[in-house]
């Protein structure tokens, strides 16, 4: 078994290892990409459209406090764009390690927040003027346009979810999640990828091959049979593509029950 897992891990280096598996689309996830285009393009003519992004930022921060990066895999407008529009034309390559590295993620987050805050402070001086809302909205519009262009190019030439590896909003969610976890809020509210029985796992690695973020669930299940990786966006793509049909999205309490049930059998 160890030998098989080592061989599979080495296969990650192959360019054709990753599969363009169909995503699981709810109505929101299926059409949320329209919001990105509306703000990024339409906002150039009507800057106030950018103010809607404030609601997005509030939503992802609050949901992350309870459920981790669930927003990324189920509600995110950019995620919808990458999965719905760019996936079919993506080269779907292995995401370079440096884009996933801590220095890159932390460094880009600091760089982004510094520039965003600097511009926000400058705009705040216009408070009370006629142009304040337009200038504030345009700040978010330009940000969305940047992600549309940069994230779109990375999606086409590397992998659909390349941007998500170092996305500042993803980092913000992880900070919110860590706070929620420290306060014990996530214990009952967070659902994680759960394997009903490790013994039934084929170790085929398909959960990794279809994972939008190229994570390796089959190698990282905890003692509670849950995938605890903070980067998991809980999109259920691996759940739908597991050949053994032993994966599901469960709370910790339900995961323990599933483990006990499998043990009895």
What are these regions (language model features)?
Residues 1-225, 230-233, 237-265:
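Non-ligating segments of multi-cofactor redox enzymes
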